[in-house]
A protein has these predicted regions:
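A boundary/linker detector
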Residues: 1-40, 217-225
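An N-terminal domain-cap segment
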Residues: 17-59, 63-70
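Short Gly/Pro-enriched turn/cap motifs at secondary-structure boundaries
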Residues: 44-45, 94-97, 131
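Extracellular structured ligand-interaction cores
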Residues: 51, 70, 100-104, 136-140, ...
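Histidine-centered nuclease catalytic patch
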Residues: 59-119
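Long, low-complexity, intrinsically disordered segments enriched in glycines and aromatic residues
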Residues: 114-169
Length: 225
């Protein structure tokens, strides 16, 4: 998982919510917001904020899926937007539907099946699930370079990997492939280690991270030549 540093809430989002309250006399819901011009703008803001990778598994996101006739990703509520129906008295149920700090972009899982990340997590909520905004989230997971397995280093990390189903065969294959082609196994890797870690930790000119970047970085930091 890649740490996400949330930017200030966009003015257009604040204004939309204020205008809705003034016009309708109630708090807006996510259903009210979905599909508006501001919703599309916010989606682009979140994609840029995350560097065009899934907030959970780090797959590339932001493209239109022709087969599904839909985007390859969705706006994700880290604390589920329907938690008020499930845990109405929980402090976590307060103002989550349109709380900017609770909004991310998650992939839709693999094509044809929502088998990991946001859609798999659904309405499950627990303080044991690590948020992408947690400053220590990158160190909470290790990766096996041989099979691509993600390994939680704490109870919270293990819970997160389970709830998000981050060890599907496809995700393990994606991570293993990304690590394999990362120059980790080059003869001169040790000479380039720090340079490569910096490269995979950084965005490209388009503002995007390389898919599965932190899996690569984590393995590179620990790899013994």
């Amino acid at each position: 998982m890649k740490h996400i540093e949330k930017l200030p809430e966009p003015d257009f989002f604040i204004n939309w919510k204020e205008n809705f309250r003034h016009s309708n006399g109630r708090e807006p819901t996510y259903k009210d917001f979905m599909g508006t011009d501001e919703w599309h703008n916010l989606r682009n803001i979140l994609l840029n904020e995350q560097g065009f990778i899934c907030c959970y598994c780090m797959k590339s996101v932001g493209d239109w899926d022709e087969d599904a006739n839909d985007w390859d990703s969705h706006i994700e509520h880290f604390i589920p937007r329907n938690i008020g129906n499930i845990q109405p008295h929980s402090y976590r149920a307060q103002n989550v539907q349109l709380n900017y700090d609770n909004l991310f972009i998650s992939c839709n899982g693999e094509r044809c099946c929502k088998d990991h990340c946001g859609h798999y997590k659904k309405s499950e909520d627990s303080p044991m699930i690590l948020s992408p905004t947690n400053p220590d989230v990158e160190e909470a997971f290790k990766y096996n370079p041989l099979d691509g397995e993600i390994i939680g280093t704490s109870a919270e990390a293990m819970t997160s990997a389970r709830v998000l189903n981050l060890n599907t065969l496809e995700l393990k294959r994606h991570r293993r492939t990304a690590i394999y082609y990362s120059e980790l196994f080059d003869e001169d890797f040790e000479e380039k280690r720090e340079q490569l870690i910096e490269f995979y930790s950084s965005r490209n000119e388009a503002g995007a991270y390389i898919p599965f970047c932190m899996a690569i970085v984590s393995v590179m930091k620990e790899w013994a030549v």
